[in-house]
């Protein structure tokens, strides 16, 4: 699961990780605003439907964290409701872990100054201009509130069965290598624990 501010490089990180992994064992899902069908169902339905089968890897870009974080940053969600949603998230991740899933959560972080610089660089390049939208700038204006909401979410949902790893995104190469290294270490650790004793 990758999360972080819009424009911090989550999509690029996913792209790099996909280059390093065997695509035959991957299920990659990007979540935007809920569709009409998803709005007619319980909140968790859209995520349950996309969980990978046992033995496969699911990559979630935009996830169950996105909606509560954005809603809280824009002041459309009370602190009490936000805390209830975070409790639901922690319960969901605990349930996945107890069922044998390896939950890896990466928070891609970029400072406000670094994010502004990155967004301007992307916007100034005709080849990447399309990647920065009015919505990205709208979200950027709420950066401080988004970070405040994010820090609270990370504290509330950082658990032994689903810990967060903060990935500094100032250096794009470091960001990608850190994400890949974390996945490799977590996969190796899980496989070693599952290996039969000799």
What spans do the regions from the language model cover?
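Glycine-rich phosphate-binding loop of ATP-dependent small-molecule kinases
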Residues: 1-198
């Amino acid at each position: 699961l990758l999360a972080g501010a819009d424009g911090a490089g989550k999509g690029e990180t996913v792209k790099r990780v996909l280059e390093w992994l065997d695509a035959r064992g991957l299920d990659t899902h990007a979540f935007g605003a809920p569709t009409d069908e998803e709005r007619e169902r319980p909140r968790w339905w859209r995520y349950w439907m996309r969980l990978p089968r046992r033995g496969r890897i699911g990559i979630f870009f935009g996830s169950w964290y996105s909606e509560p974080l954005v809603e809280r940053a824009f002041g459309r969600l009370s602190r009490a409701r936000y805390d209830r949603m975070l409790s639901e998230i922690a319960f969901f991740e605990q349930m996945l872990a107890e069922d044998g899933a390896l939950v890896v959560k990466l928070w891609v972080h970029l400072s406000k100054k670094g994010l502004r610089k990155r967004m301007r660089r992307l916007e100034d390049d005709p080849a990447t201009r399309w990647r920065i939208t009015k919505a990205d700038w709208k979200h950027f204006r709420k950066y401080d509130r988004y970070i405040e909401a994010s820090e609270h979410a990370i504290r509330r949902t950082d658990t032994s069965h689903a810990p967060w790893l903060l990935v500094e995104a100032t250096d794009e190469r470091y960001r990608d290598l850190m994400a890949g290294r974390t996945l490799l270490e977590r996969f190796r650790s899980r496989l070693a624990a599952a290996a039969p004793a000799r």
